[in-house]
């Protein structure tokens, strides 16, 4: 059986609110850490979210 190409990751807010999104990425094409600007409802702003592992 083949290994799955997509893995689940957690995007954690850099505003230190503890808010996170769970998304998936293709681990074969995106080998570096993912970061996106998304909305953090706790601070009510768009902030940078960085990839961390799901524990």
Swiss-Prot record:
Stored Gene3D superfamilies: Ribosomal protein L33
BP GO terms, sorted: translation
Keywords, alphabetical: Ribonucleoprotein, Ribosomal protein
Transcription regulation found in the keyword field: no
Record's GO cellular component terms: cytosolic large ribosomal subunit
A single MF term (Gene Ontology): structural constituent of ribosome
Keyword Metal-binding belongs to the record: no
Signal peptide (from-to): none
Entries under HAMAP family matching the protein: Ribosomal_bL33
Protein name per the record: Large ribosomal subunit protein bL33
Lineage: Bacteria, Pseudomonadati, Pseudomonadota, Alphaproteobacteria, Hyphomicrobiales
């Amino acid at each position: 059986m083949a290994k799955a190409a997509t893995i689940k990751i957690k995007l954690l807010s850099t505003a230190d609110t503890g808010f996170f999104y769970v998304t998936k990425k293709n681990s074969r094409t995106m080998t570096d850490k993912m970061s996106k600007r998304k909305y953090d409802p706790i601070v009510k702003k768009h902030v940078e979210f960085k990839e961390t592992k799901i524990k």
